Design a protein with these regions (language model features):
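Short, surface-exposed "cap/lid" segments of acyl-processing enzymes
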Residues: 80-82, 86-130
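Second-shell loop/turn segments in exported
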Residues: 102-104, 131-140, 152, 163, ...
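The feature captures the conserved acid-bearing segment of alpha/beta-hydrolase catalytic domains
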Residues: 3-51, 89, 199-261
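C-terminal catalytic histidine-bearing segment of alpha/beta-hydrolase fold enzymes
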Residues: 43-88, 137-140, 253-292
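Short glycine-enriched nucleophile-adjacent loop
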Residues: 1, 171-184
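Residue in the alpha/beta-hydrolase core beta-strand immediately N-terminal to the catalytic nucleophile
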Residues: 161-163, 167, 190-193
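Active-site loop/turn elements of alpha/beta-hydrolase fold enzymes
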Residues: 8, 122, 127-132, 197, ...
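Alpha/beta-hydrolase active-site loop
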Residues: 109, 136-164, 172-176
Length: 292
């Protein structure tokens, strides 16, 4: 890692120039001069003889100096590099939804709901469970990845309110993940919507899971769900579903919604988008602008 030199006044500018002009190749990045440099001593070169000695940025303003100093620094890799994410930003949105898919991957229901939310002014990051959970994960590992995604996209898209949405496999995992988020990240989450919630969660996609065969690694959802604030939760299920936890949750003060159809809710995407938007609005802080 080679340093960047800054000449802050006439004398500093002359010294920075001299250092670059006499530097060994690739030992400094260059010099930025925040004003005219003083004259060099007799016999001293002020210009580098080779590009490998570095560059000299003349008469640089404060921002140009700052940019020149930062440019050569190694950029940190996002903590979630390589995760199977789908970005759907909504221009000007202050709201961010993280949508964790079912174990079939990023399919028509996930795509449709996410696109509908973006049309309503909510930025969405989709999370492909099939690709992510094809290797065995732990709740702690997945929660750490989720925290990194939330923190990065809040910063990148200037979002201050977060909604967590899970469908099927993703819904089963979501209570485990929320409970393991760092407190500061958890505080940014306004609502959690669980679509097609089951009784047990798995942290690895398997063929047996597609066939409905339980795994010895499955963990019960109810103990984790009991730790969540009930007011922020929405549980949606299809009237034809036979094995869903949602109906039993209404007695706990959790909002429960029944739709037509089975586990895919008759593919009524507009109705699902409206339910999710309404849950977000109910849990938004007082005075927050509504999504369009």
């Amino acid at each position: 890692f080679a340093p960047m030199l800054v000449g802050a006044d006439a004398t500093g500018g002359a010294l920075a120039r001299l250092a670059v002009a006499n530097a060994l190749p690739q030992t400094v990045v260059g010099a930025a001069l925040n004003g005219p440099a003083a004259a060099a001593p007799p016999g001293c070169a002020l210009a580098p003889s080779s590009a490998e000695q570095g560059f000299v940025l003349e008469q640089a303003g404060p921002q140009a100096v700052a940019d020149a100093v930062v440019a050569p620094l190694p950029r940190p890799e996002p903590a979630f590099r390589g995760l199977p994410l789908i970005e759907l930003p909504a221009a000007g949105s202050h709201r961010l939804a993280i949508f964790i898919s079912g174990d079939g991957g990023w399919r028509s229901l996930d795509k449709g709901v996410s696109s509908g939310l973006r049309a309503q002014g909510v930025s969405v990051v989709g999370w492909d469970s099939l690709r992510y959970f094809w290797s065995r994960r732990t709740p702690e590992e997945t929660a750490a990845d989720l925290a990194a995604v939330i923190d990065e996209y809040r910063r990148r898209w200037h979002a201050d309110e977060v909604e967590l949405i899970g469908y099927s496999f993703g819904a089963d995992a979501m209570p485990f993940l929320y409970n393991r988020l760092p407190p500061a990240t958890r505080a940014s989450v306004r609502s959690i919507s669980l679509l097609g919630l089951g009784h047990d969660a798995s942290f690895r996609v398997s063929v047996g899971g597609w066939l409905g065969t339980p795994s010895s690694d499955d963990a019960p959802v109810e103990p984790e769900l009991a730790k969540l604030p009930p007011g922020m939760l929405l549980c949606v299920y299809g009237e034809e579903e036979k094995d869903t936890l949602c109906p039993a949750l209404a007695a706990r003060g959790i909002r429960v919604a029944k739709t037509g159809g089975g586990h895919h809710f008759d593919h009524n995407i507009p109705a699902m988008v409206e339910r999710l938007r309404a849950n977000f609005e109910r849990n938004a802080p007082a005075g927050a602008p509504a999504a369009k």
